[in-house]
Amino acid sequence: MNKLFILLCLLCSALPKLVSAQSGRVVIAVSNPISENRKEELVAIPWNDILTKFPGIDKANFKIVNLLTKKELPWQLEFKGEEKIQNLLIQMNIAANSKIKLEILKGKPAAFRAKTYGRYVPERKDDFAWENDKIAHRMYGKGLEQFPAEMAYGMDVWVKRTDKLILNDRYKRGNYHQDIGDGMDYYHVGYTLGSGDIAPYVNDSVFYPKNYRRWKILDNGPLRTTFILSYDEWNVNGRNVNVTKRISIDAGSQLSRVEAMFSSDQKSAFPVVIGIAKRENPGVMLLDEQQGFMGYWEPQFGQDGTTGVGSLLLTPATKIKITNGQLLMQTTAGNDLPVIYYTGAAWNKANEITSSKTWFDYLQSFKNRLLNPIKIVLE
């Protein structure tokens, strides 16, 4: 009798999973644990978890729907450079301290416009550029080193006031230093780390590598673009150093995620800094070593407007220093000790973030959301 009862209990517990797998649907319970709304935020669900609930899923023929509103949500399969799918990415809105339910269903998904993109730009001196629906950036390559008058090191910003992807159009027309309605490049990098690049820092000096030498795209939209930039070894105060940067940008975000992996011929850790170019005229700064937070609202640049730049660590900074040309946030790197941070920019003429207050509020909210991620349960 007891064995029969146990068997029945096991069958009952397995029945919902069996029904879910056979019906071709999975319910995703989503909860927001913080007291602020989350807009256009990406969540990542391990693909193996999806396969466990929906083993027969057709990866090219499913859609994700909000059970309450019946609205279809955009999604992306993330590979991270691997042959097999790693994550299902879903972009969603969810109100403060609230819960929603989504459903994965069989069927042809709606067409959604790509919101992220990146590429190597051989026609422009080996740039590597990336963007989303909010902002665009580029890193400089080997080709630029042949033009000393134009030479620059750090991360550049291309401001936008459109949610359309603009990189290819701007490179094609060549003159992207004038705003023809969608934004422009007026940000000056020069011999600085620009809008949040990273480099070793020893004896009050930034040790810049040469510009990046190799690139690899791991994922390229529509909701997340991820790529790797690799650099040649260089000497840092008697230490030989290498770095590889894995950079990703999500749709709807002003900031990119950077994972910088440094290696050295010496075992000891060493200081590195994340830098933001500082202008001669006064701007507004919000610096917090304990929070690992560096925000800068630049002075207005004539008719071109104002750019806000910011960088965030998830751990406290060792120190933050203001020099003549840069804001520098120091942390520690070493072999097998990646530095993970977020950095990006905003433009007041996009009419979303229009003041130092709204920029600093955005940065603080961004970090709060990182520390309190959306919770996901597959039912």
Place the predicted regions along the sequence by residue.
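Solvent-exposed beta-strand/loop surfaces of large extracellular or lumenal domains
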Residues: I57-Q86, N235, P282-E298, T307-K319
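Extended acidic/polar, glycine-enriched regions
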Residues: E82-E123, V272-V284, F293-D304, S311, ...
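Alpha-mannosidase-like glycoside hydrolase catalytic domains involved in N-glycan trimming
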Residues: Q22-G118
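Extended, loop-rich substrate-binding clefts of extracytoplasmic carbohydrate-active enzymes
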Residues: K172-A251
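Beta-strand-rich recognition/accessory modules
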Residues: Q86-M92, S311-E379
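Bacterial Sec-dependent N-terminal signal peptides
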Residues: M1-V26
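Solvent-exposed N-terminal domain segments of exported/luminal and surface proteins
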Residues: E103, K108-V206
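Acidic (Asp/Glu-rich), glycine- and aromatic
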Residues: V243, L255-L287
